[in-house]
A protein has these predicted regions:
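A short, conserved alpha-helix within the catalytic core of class I
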Residues: 166-178
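N-terminal auxiliary segments of SAM/dcSAM-dependent transferases
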Residues: 1-34, 41
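Conserved class I S-adenosyl-L-methionine
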Residues: 77-86
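Conserved SAM/SAH-binding beta-strand->alpha-helix loop
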Residues: 112-114
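Class I SAM-dependent methyltransferase Rossmann-like catalytic core
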Residues: 27-77
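Conserved beta-strand signature within the Rossmann-like core of class I S-adenosyl-L-methionine
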Residues: 181-198
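Substrate-binding/catalytic lobe of Class I Rossmann-like enzymes that use SAM or dcSAM, i.e.
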Residues: 203-285, 289-299
Length: 322
């Protein structure tokens, strides 16, 4: 398949999802995966450096402090697959700890080509680590990785940060069950979960005063303009972060500041929006410390360890397949 043909297929999928989301009855929405084009991926890396966004620092601290302990608790894997690797900087701690024990194959699985390229640059030269990247949806990439290994080799799946929080709770359970279906006894999953905190602390993490998160969210409209020929006026929308206490999640929206009409030729769509109406772009569900154990059981795993950061309540949870 030529790169041009592949790009056309991506744009076609994008157009279909944009059309479906913006015509959805009740609440317009767009899939959060489309936030992460090249510009969005760079903006997200900037978000991770913000003082208000403590999640990435907590994630990294736990891996830095406990990498050897994490590796010691899991059946030693020959293969490591990471769902949504990003730049891969924090994963270095685990791979270096693992490389002390054996030659390892590392497979970053990303939908963002820019993030995948950054990861390959960051981790491609590690001693005793062979890197093979997959630009695929998570489950498709994981199935491809599982097909590569020998029968006796163990596989560890990394799902770090709080990406699981982007799924609503039933969808998270369903996704984790599908991950389990790919795995074999002796395989493991290291899952990051962000815990509930003071509401104002949580809101600041998703609506920083500098405006980086706002730019990240608004870039989705700019992407639709670039790739689908739309005429969204970014100044006519604002970034909105809300705490949904009933669902225990942060919601990111783009709110229309006036009554307006937007043409999206690439999706064969004309959108009419009222002042105050929103487009829901992302959710981040928060958890309580006991919940990962229950999630593991529902998905067919057993949790054998949990490491919690005290500065920013966040956990790495180690699950195994028995």
């Amino acid at each position: 398949m030529s790169s041009q043909t592949a790009q056309q297929l991506v744009l076609s999928d994008f157009a279909v999802d944009v059309r479906a989301g913006l015509t959805k009855p009740g609440q317009r929405e767009l899939p959060s995966k489309y936030l992460y084009d090249e510009v969005g991926s760079e903006l997200f890396e900037a978000i991770c450096l913000l003082q208000e966004y403590g999640l990435t620092r907590a994630d990294t601290r736990l891996l830095q402090r406990h990498a050897n302990e994490i590796i010691a608790r899991m059946p030693l894997p020959a293969h490591v697959a990471e769902l949504g690797s990003g730049s891969g900087k924090k994963t270095r701690y685990l791979l270096e700890a693992l490389a002390c024990h054996r030659q390892t194959f590392y497979y970053p699985i990303e939908i963002s080509p820019a993030a995948l390229a950054a990861c390959e640059k960051e981790l491609g030269q590690l001693d005793c680590v062979s890197l093979v990247g997959y630009e695929k949806p998570y489950l498709e990439g994981l199935r491809a990785v599982a097909a590569r290994r020998e029968a006796q080799d163990h596989l560890c799946v990394l799902f770090l940060g709080s990406t699981i929080g982007n799924f609503d709770r039933p969808a998270a359970d369903d996704f984790l069950r599908q991950v389990r279906e790919v795995l074999e006894p002796g395989d493991s999953l290291l899952l990051g979960t962000d815990f509930e905190k003071d509401v104002n602390v949580q809101l600041l993490a998703y609506d920083d005063p500098v405006g980086v998160t706002a730019a990240f969210n608004l870039n989705l409209l700019a992407r639709i303009n670039r790739e689908l020929g739309a005429d969204f006026r970014l100044r006519d929308f604002r970034h909105l972060a809300l705490w949904n206490s009933a669902e225990r999640r942060i919601e990111m929206h783009l709110q229309s500041l006036r009554r307006q009409r937007v043409n999206i030729p690439g999706a064969a769509l004309l959108v009419r929006m009222e002042e105050g109406e929103t487009i829901w772009t992302e959710s981040s569900h928060k958890y309580r410390p006991h919940e990962p154990v229950e999630m593991a059981a529902r998905a067919g795993f057993r949790q054998i360890a949990q490491w919690v950061d005290e500065e920013w309540p966040f956990a790495q949870n180690l699950w195994i397949v028995e």
